[in-house]
């Protein structure tokens, strides 16, 4: 995984590899927050190639019909409908609580999909406060996703603050298409 410094345009690239993660079972959590849902996955990277261990979704965030689905090693472990999950913070707390007893190790890194990072986040970037501020600043470019993306990053940093967090922006695809 190639990770650029806090300001990708200004810093040299550094390498963050699964071998550099600090747990026995090297697990990477991925989050993709949208306007009314959050998708998540947990991948074991101890053996090199990522192996999906858990995945799921919280749907209909903000409604009386919210749903949480959790799949562990290909088996549905939890599928609860008609929850009343008021917002993304509550949805992320539900994800954290549902994942905790299922994980075969500790989260060693967190990856965040961000829809638009503006002109400053043009590739994968190690998260710091400036990166989160930039995601917020680009809310007008992706109003249904960036606010939820920033909230997800803040929540995850509060929950798993002692591990690296990386944003990957889909605007990279736009830059590729322009070439």
Per-range role (PLM):
Residues 37-85:
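Short glycine-rich, Thr/Ser-proximal phosphate-binding strand/loop in the N-terminal lobe
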Residues 28-30, 109-111, 167:
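Short glycine-aspartate micro-motif
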Residues 73-113:
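Glycine-rich, N-terminal phosphate-binding loop and its surrounding beta-alpha-beta segment
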Residues 1-24:
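N-terminal mitochondrial targeting presequence
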Residues 31-36:
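A short acidic Gly-Thr/Ser loop motif
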Residues 99-144, 175-179:
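Short beta-strand-loop/turn "lid" adjacent to the catalytic site in phosphate-handling enzymes
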Residues 135-179:
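Active-site neighborhood for divalent-cation/phosphate handling
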């Amino acid at each position: 995984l190639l990770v650029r410094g806090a300001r990708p345009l200004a810093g040299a690239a550094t390498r963050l590899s699964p071998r550099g993660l600090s747990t026995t079972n090297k697990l990477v959590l991925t989050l993709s927050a949208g306007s009314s849902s959050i998708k998540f996955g947990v991948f074991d990277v101890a053996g090199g190639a990522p192996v999906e261990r858990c995945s799921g979704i919280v749907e209909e965030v903000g409604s009386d019909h919210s749903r949480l689905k959790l799949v562990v090693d290909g088996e549905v472990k939890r599928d609860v409908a008609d929850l009343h999950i008021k917002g993304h913070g509550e949805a992320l707390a539900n994800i954290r609580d549902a994942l905790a007893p299922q994980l075969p190790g500790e989260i060693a890194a967190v990856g965040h999909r961000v829809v638009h990072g503006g002109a400053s986040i043009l590739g994968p970037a190690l998260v710091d406060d400036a990166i989160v501020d930039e995601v917020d600043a680009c809310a007008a470019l992706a109003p249904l996703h960036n606010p939820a993306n920033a909230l997800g990053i803040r929540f995850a940093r509060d929950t798993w603050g002692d591990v690296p967090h990386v944003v990957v922006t889909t605007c990279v695809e736009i830059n590729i298409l322009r070439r």
